[in-house]
Amino acid sequence: MEVHLKQERSEKPSFWGDLAISFPSLKGAPSTRYYFECEQILYRDFFPGLRGKLLLKTDLWNEAKNTEILGWAADQGAQPVGFDIALDLVRQAAAVFGNHRFTFLNSDVRHLPFAMNTFDLLYSMGTIEHFPEYKLAVAELFRVLKPNGTAIIGVPNKLDPFLRPLLVYALSLFRLYPYGMEKSFTPGELQRLLESVGFRVTTRTGILFMPGWLRMADLWCHCRVPWLTAITGPLVKIFAAL
């Protein structure tokens, strides 16, 4: 395991660092398994032939707390590089993947420590919406991706039929949403944002098609009352089958 721990100046590390320490693992929950299956489909569809490809992933939340998708990508032959703004998340991810040769860094997506045209593949799922400088972030992602590279960039869908953005807004009003600021985008808004920094958008798609309340309820049950996932699990499977 190769791990670089490099502090970056930012307003966010204390928030995400505190969350890394206080937040439980979501691994093993039925909705997390569904999330992992969705990510595998994305990789197979848009990152064919992973072997030998240098893959950059923004944030290490999923590696520390969730789907561990980088481990699966490494098993397919990719050469993963991941970074996170929170040093504690970097350390937790490093502990999970101690038997793999990854490069993990403590860094900020708005100021990446990589040269231009470095990566073959780029995966960013649920990162850029958590701060106002999302345009700076996608410009940095475009800068470090090779000209013939492929990126998967995902954000919350403002047109979610299950009204997740409204749920997040309501929870945030009462300080019940743990992930801080979270901006949602329509598909058109995201495409215009990406094209404004140079990306060429070829496909629009989505993952984790289920109500936000069900995902939250399933995770709460998994962490607090595990036997209740016998109820949430079948509900998750219904949406996974749609």
Question: Which residues does each predicted region cover?
Answer:
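Conserved class I S-adenosyl-L-methionine
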Residues: 1-51, 150-174, 215
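Short alpha-helix
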Residues: 181-198, 204
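Class I SAM-dependent methyltransferase SAM/SAH-binding core
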Residues: 54-111
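Acceptor-substrate binding/catalytic loop of class I
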Residues: 32-34, 172-189
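A conserved beta-strand element that flanks and buttresses the S-adenosyl-L-methionine
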Residues: 123
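A C-terminal cap/extension of S-adenosyl-L-methionine-dependent methyltransferases
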Residues: 168, 203-242
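A short glycine-rich, Lys/Arg-flanked "PGG" loop and its adjoining helix->strand segment in the class I
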Residues: 135-150
